[in-house]
Curated annotation (Swiss-Prot):
Protein name in UniProt: Putative transport protein BU123
GO cellular component: plasma membrane
Location of the protein in the cell: Cell membrane
InterPro entries: AI-2E-like
Family designation: Belongs to the autoinducer-2 exporter (AI-2E) (TC 2.A.86) family.
């Protein structure tokens, strides 16, 4: 016969479990709006912690001044690109708005469409039909897409607002993490030790190395490439160079490189018979492209002695899977999984990778 006390203990355990799970879910919903900002702050602080310590040492050990300087640096890094982006968009939009609003709005003839093989004549005739309809036919054609375009525009405005909010949260959390870095580090080490007494500390160190490797090998390389590409575009006289420079930065982050932007710019210069500057920009683009393959492995090695192919695969896969957050999630997960697998195959401790990289 079942003991009533055991039945009561089982019911109490189930209720306790339900209560704990409910509290966990509610807590997650409460902190959910802050997760993205806190995550970015954590990655930035981990990557720049050595820099903050050097600044603190120069300032005579004053943590408050070092934190203020780091926040100013982050402000400049986030505000200046956004300022250039908004300024470039405004500068680009004003001529287009004036052109669309002018009474003498005329669309080009585009006679060269006839020279396209096979379908050129059909495309040209359809285009001429649109021109001869005084815009009515054109409006009828694009009307089904206007709703989608408006929806897309509203979503992008919303995303810009969320970006500003998350940037403010990121700066706030960064200041807190810089100020209490040692205490938080001790708590994280205790948590890692509770998860695995044998490998917890080593896994934590590998994750830190992966974050710093990505920050140096991917983010810093992308920034250098964007700056050098922007200089080339500015000197060559390519319009909207600041906007293109920011696009190049994100293109380098997702490992496409600067060439998808630089090559059309070179073609544009040659198209406008500016062959001298087109040739100069071509040579400069080759230099920037080659520099990428030199700086990236060098900076990754500085950040950590990790497999370069594994790190870059983590960056690309993380970006495709998780978005910009995956820039750090991908390499960290892949590196830890790779080290765990190798340590299991060879029957060695993960900590040995921090001293011996012969199995890499």
């Amino acid at each position: 016969m079942q003991n009533p006390k055991e039945k009561m203990d089982l019911s109490q355990s189930i209720l306790s479990l339900i209560f704990i799970v409910s509290m966990g879910v509610i807590s997650f919903l409460v902190i959910h709006p802050f997760i993205l900002g806190f995550f970015w702050a954590s990655m930035i602080v981990i990557a720049t912690w050595p820099l903050m310590l050097k600044i603190q040492k120069i300032l005579g050990g004053k943590r408050s001044l070092a934190v203020i300087i780091m926040i100013i640096i982050l402000l400049l890094l986030f505000i200046i690109p956004v300022f250039f982006l908004v300024n470039s968009l405004i500068a680009t939009s004003i001529p287009i708005i004036h052109w669309l609003g002018s009474n003498d709005l005329e669309l080009p003839e585009l006679a060269w469409l006839q020279n396209i093989p096979l379908m050129g004549r059909k495309i040209f005739n359809s285009y001429q039909t649109l021109l001869n309809s005084d815009g009515g036919e054109l409006i009828h054609k694009i009307r089904p897409y206007m709703g989608h375009a408006t929806e897309f525009f509203i979503i992008q405005v919303r995303n810009c607002g969320l970006f500003i909010v998350h940037s403010i949260l990121m700066l706030f959390f960064s200041a807190l993490l810089y100020w209490n870095g040692e205490k938080i580090s001790i708590s994280i080490h205790h948590f890692a030790y509770r998860l695995s007494e044998k490998n917890g500390k080593a896994i934590l160190l590998l994750a830190t190395q992966a974050v710093r490797a990505v920050a140096l090998g991917v983010a810093v390389t992308a920034l250098i490439q964007a700056l050098l590409s922007g200089i080339g575009l500015l000197v060559s006289g390519v319009p909207y160079w600041a906007l293109l420079m920011i696009i190049i930065f994100f293109s380098c982050l997702i490992q496409l490189g600067p060439l998808p932007i630089l090559i059309p710019s070179i073609i544009w210069l040659y198209w406008n018979d500016d062959t001298t500057w087109g040739t100069i920009l071509l040579i400069w683009s080759c230099f920037v492209f080659i520099l990428d393959h030199i700086l990236r492995p060098f900076f990754i090695r500085i950040g950590a002695d990790l497999p370069i192919l594994l790190t870059l695969s983590g960056v690309i896969g993380g970006l495709l899977t998780f978005g910009m957050i995956g820039l750090f999630i991908g390499p960290v997960v892949l590196v830890i999984f790779y080290r765990l697998t190798i340590s299991w195959i060879y029957g060695i401790s993960i900590a040995s990778f921090l001293e011996n990289t012969s199995l890499k």
